[in-house]
Swiss-Prot record:
It comes from Gallus gallus (Chicken). This is Neuronal acetylcholine receptor subunit beta-4. It is a multi-pass membrane protein. Keywords: Cell membrane, Disulfide bond, Glycoprotein, Ion channel, Ion transport, Ligand-gated ion channel, Membrane, Metal-binding, Receptor, Signal, Sodium, Synapse, Transmembrane, Transmembrane helix, Transport. The lineage of its organism: Eukaryota, Metazoa, Chordata, Craniata, Vertebrata. SUPFAM superfamilies: Neurotransmitter-gated ion-channel transmembrane pore, Nicotinic receptor ligand binding domain-like. It is found in: Synaptic cell membrane; Cell membrane. The record marks 114 as: Key residue for a low dissociation (K(off)) from the conotoxin BuIA. Its main location: membrane. It comes from the Eukaryota. Neuronal AChR is composed of two different types of subunits: alpha and beta. CHRNB4/Beta-4 subunit can be combined to CHRNA2/alpha-2, CHRNA3/alpha-3 or CHRNA4/alpha-4, CHRNA5/alpha-5 and CHRNB3/beta-3 to give rise to functional receptors. Component of neuronal acetylcholine receptors (nAChRs) that function as pentameric, ligand-gated cation channels with high calcium permeability among other activities. nAChRs are excitatory neurotrasnmitter receptors formed by a collection of nAChR subunits known to mediate synaptic transmission in the nervous system and the neuromuscular junction. Each nAchR subunit confers differential attributes to channel properties, including activation, deactivation and desensitization kinetics, pH sensitivity, cation permeability, and binding to allosteric modulators. One of its GO terms (molecular function) is acetylcholine-gated monoatomic cation-selective channel activity. Belongs to the ligand-gated ion channel (TC 1.A.9) family. Acetylcholine receptor (TC 1.A.9.1) subfamily. Beta-4/CHRNB4 sub-subfamily. The chain crosses the membrane at residues 217-237, 246-266, 279-299, 439-459.
Amino acid sequence: STAADAEEKLMNHLLSPDRYNKLIRPAVNSSQLVSIELQVSLAQLISVNEREQIMTTNVWLNQEWIDYRLAWKPSDYEGINMLRIPAKHIWLPDIVLYNNADGTYEVSLYTNAIVQNNGSIRWLPPAIYKSACKIEVKHFPFDQQNCTLKFRSWTYDHTEIDMVLKTSMASMDDFTPSGEWDIVALPGRRTENPLDPNYVDVTYDFIIKRKPLFYTINLIIPCVLITSLAILVFYLPSDCGEKMTLCISVLLALTVFLLLISKIVPPTSLDVPLIGKYLMFTMVLVTFSIVTSVCVLNVHHRSPSTHTMPPWVKLVFLERLPAYLFMKRPENNSPRQKPANCKKTRAENLCMDPADFYKNSTYFVNTASAKKYDMKITDTLDNVSSHQDFRLRTGTKFSPEVQEAIDGVSFIAEHMKSDDNDQSVIEDWKYVAMVVDRLFLWIFVLVCVLGTVGLFLQPLFQNHIAATNP
């Protein structure tokens, strides 16, 4: 007979209804345990849905056991020592994924089982599992997750079958790398319940680490750049009128990023994701920059008619702080300033203020003008007596017209002097606002750099999630 005839004869013999019932557990007696060796082979990590907390994987569930009823002598059947029998024609252990998330407990395809002549059976069905996975969002997007696959018999307890872990690690021989996750480890463990002797399961821990490049490019770097714009608010001149506009725009941009984060991570109150902490940190900074900008603008637009500058403000913001902030106030070269090095002469009244000059009892007048207004002149200075055009007036009164002109000139001089003083105070207030701006610029740069580095260095020191028994 041919090999095909021998195989058909063997198949009919093994699966004959008279000697084999696929509904009966392959045990010699009721007290015998059927040992099931189990190993998971990971083919693909399809996705991890953070918001729904579901991990989708493509695995091969390798199961091995012995069915004494399917043993034969190869010499009786043309030396055939292995058969491939459709799985639905033999007894199968009803091992299912206990922590599935979509109600699909069984495998995707009932493949053929490989049966050896000694009765050992190896069944390797593929399955796409959606398992519940508790997402730890504390270090997102630099996070590491521990998702488990828990396998257990649905109807048989520990008194009927014994689940044995074939190897301590899941197989990755046929694994296709994921673009989002790195596999850190796939340890397996066999779990028994001391309080329930009938309980046994096999659990695999999928310890995976996220590849953060996508979120770094699309979330973190834009947030850092937007935060730097908030810092530049303090370098913006107060006169341009765009300080508040820039602050509000940056705050709105950060709010949009915060909404994006809320759609990615699960709505849990146990932890705040790292990127969420950073966004809140930057939003607090921007809010504080708005408050400080309001204060700076208030100082910038102060005047002598509304505010008096306290001495301590002059001491701190005009004398002390600028040196520490590397600021140097330019010299005031206003043409209205009095000459600083006016030389003292015998005619020192020439250096007096206009009001004092005209009110003084002695000053120079033109001789022609003096005759016209009947002024008495006298030569009292040696260095002036030689001049024919100018003489000194002694203490005589002016005519009403001249006195009125002198009063007008004196009023104008006093008004100009008052304007100069007011303008000087206004410039002082503006410089104080500039110093405050520069002070907060350095403070914000320091806080922003330290806060950013401190937050994003945390994942480097996180502990790896280890597999622990429940």
